[in-house]
Amino acid sequence: MKTLLLTLVVVTIVCLDLGYTLTCLNCPEMFCGKFQTCRNGEKICFKMLQQRRPFSLRYIRGCAATCPGTKPRDMVECCSTDRCNR
């Protein structure tokens, strides 16, 4: 009986989604060391480079539910593993 109960507990733990959360870099600088744990539903890390005017660049990194769209002259890279948006 104890073996059956233990087996059921193990199967339940394995089959349940234990709430894995993604970790992404989150900062506006080119060189970044600040991480954030993404919220539920955010399964994408992104790195965006925005060109505001000639020789003026803005870096944005963070979590998202989907890969963000860009404007002309902007670049975005998306990935789905921990700390992949370096």
Swiss-Prot record:
What are the GO cellular component annotations? extracellular region
Keyword annotations for this protein, in alphabetical order, are: Acetylcholine receptor inhibiting toxin, Disulfide bond, Ion channel impairing toxin, Neurotoxin, Postsynaptic neurotoxin, Secreted, Signal, Toxin
Tissues in which the protein is found: Expressed by the venom gland.
Disulphide bonds annotated for this chain are: C24-C45, C27-C32, C38-C63, C67-C78, C79-C84
The molecular function terms of the Gene Ontology recorded here are: acetylcholine receptor inhibitor activity; ion channel regulator activity; toxin activity
List the signal peptide residues: 1-21
The entry assigns this protein to a family as follows:
Belongs to the three-finger toxin family. Ancestral subfamily. Orphan group II sub-subfamily.
Protein's UniProt name: Weak neurotoxin 8
Please tell me the species this chain comes from.
Naja sputatrix
